[in-house]
Amino acid sequence: MLAACSSGPDPEEVISQDIATQFDPIKNLDQAAVDELAQDAESGADLSDFGIDGAEYIKAMLGGFDYSIVSVNVAEDGQSATAIVNVTCKSFNAANDRANEISEEFAASDEITDMSMDDLNKKIGEILMQAMNETEPSTVECEFQYNLVDGTWTMSDSAESEIYNAFFS
């Protein structure tokens, strides 16, 4: 009788599950994930000054978010791996371009001359939300590096820059 040798769970499956654990709450607009991202967004910008609810902005930003794992390749030494993931998301650059277009249209109207500063800030918020809502998601290929650390597959710190690049492509 041959004894089965098992070196533990399949690295590709473990890494795929880790990616799903991180991206599924975003894809599914999980309330805890939305709240965490909204808190981060509100701490970085005074969205409330423009009448923007942080959670609503995050939901608009994540509209259409999706991902698909293209491949997970483990290095020959078994200590590192690369996951290729197609991330579909809205681009802040595209939303900013759209906000500029809407702002130019608004600035050309006579409406702006009769507005108080509060009304103008509210209008800016409306423009930002409209631009984000109108921005179509696009797909960007991201490459996530993993390392086997003390028996656990861990995503490298470079993942943040990959996600940043996807949202600012």
What does each of the following model-derived ranges do?
Residues 66-70, 127-129:
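Short structured motifs
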Residues 2-4:
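C-terminal motif of bacterial Sec signal peptides marking the signal peptidase cleavage site
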Residues 7-68:
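Core segments of small alpha/beta cavity-forming domains
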Residues 79-89:
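A short hydrophobic beta-strand element
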Residues 104-119, 130-169:
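Short beta-strand edge/turn micro-motifs at domain boundaries
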Residues 75-77, 149:
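Structural motif
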Residues 88-105:
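Short, cysteine-centered beta-strand-loop-beta hairpins and adjacent loop/turn segments enriched
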Residues 121-124:
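C-terminal low-complexity, charged extensions that often adopt amphipathic alpha-helices
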